[in-house]
């Protein structure tokens, strides 16, 4: 068996010389005895002729070889996506590998059926193996948990005209909870005034203030992204003072 563009190899090849008289003789085949070898293209059954000349007389015998354009090596050309969120399918659409065969080297696109070793439910670094033509190369990916949203409790409160936001938050013990795709809900934390926008202490109409949370978890896929929910606020117009004008009588 030969690869495309391989040189002829007659190592361990022998012929048996049978003469009219005497015992048979074993001769080592040399490359100059062989004709018909052409490894420039594939051939499943290429006949080679072995010629032996003695005393001006030449005898021949034949054997067959196969020529196949076989993969000898693969290497990563363009690494595909390496950062994934929990339970995300692998994406190799931007990846290419360099494939070396007997005929030369060319770049081909990575397809999903070449990939092994990926588990979208396992957080952390993983080694991904690419297999092509019996040869392999690999690269590393990182699967991270991610924030799916936030919630606040309570999410609707009442107050009095001109109440400060901080007083409303503290007086109602408002907490917020961050939920991750895999880890689930985290321990509740106290809401801070800086997280709330859109509150007007002098408005008596129903208000929907926006609560914003920025993911600062460096191990999270959504690190740096913001998530919002609404805080419903209703201020009452309570009597703050009564004055009197005395009757004239």
Which functions belong to the PLM regions below?
Residues 64-73, 141-149, 231-240:
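Short domain-boundary/entry signatures in modular proteins, especially
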Residues 22-67, 81-82, 103-139, 182-228, ...:
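Serine/threonine-rich, repeat-prone extracellular segments and beta-strand-based repeat modules
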Residues 1-23, 72-105, 148-185, 238-249:
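Solvent-exposed, low-complexity, repeat-rich "mucin-like" stalks and linkers
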């Amino acid at each position: 068996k030969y690869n495309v563009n391989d040189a002829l190899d007659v190592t361990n090849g022998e012929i048996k010389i049978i003469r009219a008289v005497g015992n048979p003789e074993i001769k080592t085949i040399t490359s100059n005895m062989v004709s018909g070898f052409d490894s420039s293209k594939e051939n499943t059954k290429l006949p080679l002729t072995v010629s032996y000349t003695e005393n001006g007389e030449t005898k021949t015998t034949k054997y067959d070889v196969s020529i196949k354009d076989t993969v000898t090596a693969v290497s990563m050309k363009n690494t595909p996506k390496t950062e994934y969120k929990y339970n995300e399918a692998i994406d190799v659409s931007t990846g290419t590998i360099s494939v070396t065969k007997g005929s030369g080297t060319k770049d081909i696109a990575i397809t999903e059926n070449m990939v092994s070793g990926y588990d979208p439910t396992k957080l952390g670094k993983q080694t991904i193996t690419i297999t092509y033509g019996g040869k392999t190369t690999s690269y590393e990916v990182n699967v991270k948990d991610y924030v799916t949203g936030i919630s606040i409790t309570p999410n609707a409160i009442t107050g009095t005209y001109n109440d400060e936001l901080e007083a409303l938050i503290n007086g109602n013990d408002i907490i917020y909870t961050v939920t991750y795709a895999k880890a689930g809900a985290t321990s509740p934390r106290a809401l801070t005034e800086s997280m709330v926008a859109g509150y007007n202490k002098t408005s008596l109409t129903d208000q929907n203030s926006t609560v914003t949370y920025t993911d600062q978890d460096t191990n999270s896929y959504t690190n740096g992204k913001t998530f919002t929910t609404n805080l419903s606020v209703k201020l009452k117009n309570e009597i703050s003072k009564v004055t009197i004008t005395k009757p004239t009588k």
